C-alpha cells in the first residue's frame, strides 16, 4: 500500500540522515513488466538483460535503455548487484530503496522465469559512478526486513565464474543457514546460499543452492561432499553443479554403445546402385530389430517424462557476488 509517496509495510533500516523513499506510484508504472523473466543466464545473459530490462527514464516510463543490466560489460562502474534480498521483496521496493541515492537507469530482482520464485538477488544500474559508489557506502549491510543485504559492484561475466553454483540434495529437513555454512564453508568463500523451503510450512525441503566465489572452490566441495553423509545427517549428500537453463539434457538419457531392450539386427544396407536404391540385407529387419525399435521408443518416452518433471535449477549468474 502506498501513502503519500511512501511504501508502507516495509522495515528498512536506513542510515541516519537519509530521506524517505523517493518512489511514488506516479514515478514508474511497474505493471508493464514482462511476465517471462530470468531467461538463459549463460551465453544469452546479455540478450536477456536487453530484452527484459526495467529501464527507468527521466519520465518514469519503461525505457529502451542501452545501459541495461548487461552483467557489467559496459557499465561496470554503475551496475550494482544486491544480494540477500527478502524472499517477498518486489522490484518496486528495490527501486524505492536505491532511488534515495540518485537516478536509476535499470533495476530488477532475478526470478525463476516460470514460477516467479525470487533468487534473492538483483541488479541496480545507476546513472553515474558517483551514485553507485555512494549506494555501496550507504546501503551495504543495512537490514531490509529480516535480511542484511550486501551491495557491491557487479563483476563482468567470464569463463572463470562458471560452475560456481552448486545444487545440493538429501540435506536434513531441519538444516539451518549456519549448519550449511559449517558444512560447505571450509572449502571456500560462500557468496550466496539458499535453502529451499515448503511454501506452506516454511520447513526445509532438504534441497539448497550454494554459490562459491571460485570454480575451484565449488569443485573441491563436490569432491569432498558428494555421496558423503555430513555430520548430523542421515543420507549421503548429492552435490553437483546447478544446471544452466537451455542446456540440452537429451544426451543423458541414452547411454552410448549400449542398445536398449533388445539387440539390433546385423543386416547391412545394400550398396547404392547406379540410379537405383540398393536393397537392404535380408537379416537386417527381423524380430530382434523390431524389439530394439520398441525398446528405443520406450527409452525415449521415459527420458521425456524425466525431462518434463525435472525441476528447473537455478540458472548461472555471472555476476553473483
Swiss-Prot record:
GO molecular function: mRNA binding
Assigned GO CC terms: nucleus; ribonucleoprotein complex
GO biological processes: alternative mRNA splicing, via spliceosome; sex determination
Keywords: Nucleus, Repeat, RNA-binding
Tree of life domain: Eukaryota
Cellular localization per UniProt: Nucleus
Pfam families, A to Z: RRM_1
Organs and tissues of expression: Expressed in gonads and somatic tissues of both sexes. In the ovary, expressed in the last egg chamber of each ovariole. Highly expressed in nurse cells with low expression found in oocytes. Highly expressed in testis with lower expression in testis sheath and vas deferentia.
InterPro entries xrefs: Euk_RNA-bind_prot (IPR050502), Hud_Sxl_RNA (IPR002343), Nucleotide-bd_a/b_plait_sf (IPR012677), RBD_domain_sf (IPR035979), RRM_dom (IPR000504), Sxl (IPR006546)
Domain RRM: 78-156, 164-244
SUPFAM superfamilies, per database record: RNA-binding domain, RBD
Chief place where the protein resides: nucleus
NCBIfam families: sex-lethal
Role, per record: Unknown; apparently not involved in somatic sex determination.
Protein known as: Sex-lethal homolog
Annotated organism of origin: Megaselia scalaris (Humpbacked fly)
Amino acid at each position: 500500500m502506498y501513502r503519500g509517496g511512501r511504501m508502507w509495510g516495509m522495515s528498512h533500516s536506513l542510515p541516519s540522515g537519509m530521506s524517505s523513499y523517493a518512489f511514488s506510484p506516479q514515478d514508474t508504472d511497474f505493471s508493464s513488466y514482462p511476465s517471462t523473466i530470468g531467461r538463459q543466464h549463460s551465453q544469452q545473459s546479455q540478450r536477456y538483460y536487453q530484452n527484459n530490462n526495467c529501464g527507468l527514464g527521466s519520465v518514469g516510463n519503461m525505457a529502451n535503455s542501452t545501459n541495461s543490466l548487461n552483467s557489467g560489460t559496459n557499465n561496470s562502474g554503475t551496475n550494482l548487484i544486491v544480494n540477500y534480498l527478502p524472499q517477498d521483496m518486489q522490484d518496486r521496493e528495490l527501486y524505492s530503496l536505491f532511488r534515495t541515492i540518485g537516478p536509476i537507469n535499470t533495476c530488477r530482482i532475478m526470478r525463476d522465469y516460470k514460477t516467479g520464485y525470487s533468487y534473492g538477488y538483483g541488479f541496480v544500474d545507476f546513472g553515474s559512478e558517483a551514485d553507485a559508489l555512494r549506494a555501496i557506502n550507504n546501503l551495504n549491510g543495512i537490514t531490509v526486513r529480516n535480511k542484511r543485504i550486501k551491495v557491491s559492484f557487479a563483476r563482468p561475466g567470464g569463463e572463470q565464474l562458471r560452475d560456481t553454483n552448486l545444487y545440493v540434495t538429501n540435506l536434513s529437513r531441519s538444516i539451518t543457514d549456519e549448519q550449511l555454512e559449517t558444512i560447505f564453508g571450509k572449502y571456500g568463500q560462500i557468496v550466496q546460499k539458499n535453502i529451499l523451503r515448503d511454501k506452506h510450512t516454511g520447513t526445509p525441503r532438504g534441497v539448497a543452492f550454494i554459490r562459491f566465489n571460485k570454480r575451484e572452490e565449488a569443485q573441491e566441495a563436490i569432491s569432498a561432499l558428494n555421496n558423503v553423509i555430513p555430520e548430523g545427517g542421515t543420507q549421503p549428500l548429492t552435490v553437483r553443479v546447478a544446471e544452466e537453463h537451455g542446456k540440452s539434457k537429451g544426451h543423458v538419457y541414452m547411454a552410448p554403445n549400449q542398445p536398449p531392450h533388445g539387440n539390433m539386427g546385423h543386416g547391412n544396407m545394400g550398396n547404392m546402385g547406379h540410379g537405383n536404391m540398393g536393397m537392404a540385407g535380408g537379416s537386417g529387419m527381423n524380430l530382434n530389430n523390431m524389439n530394439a525399435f520398441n525398446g528405443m521408443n520406450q527409452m525415449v518416452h521415459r527420458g521425456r517424462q524425466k525431462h518434463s518433471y525435472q525441476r528447473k535449477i537455478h540458472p548461472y549468474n555471472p555476476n553473483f557476488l
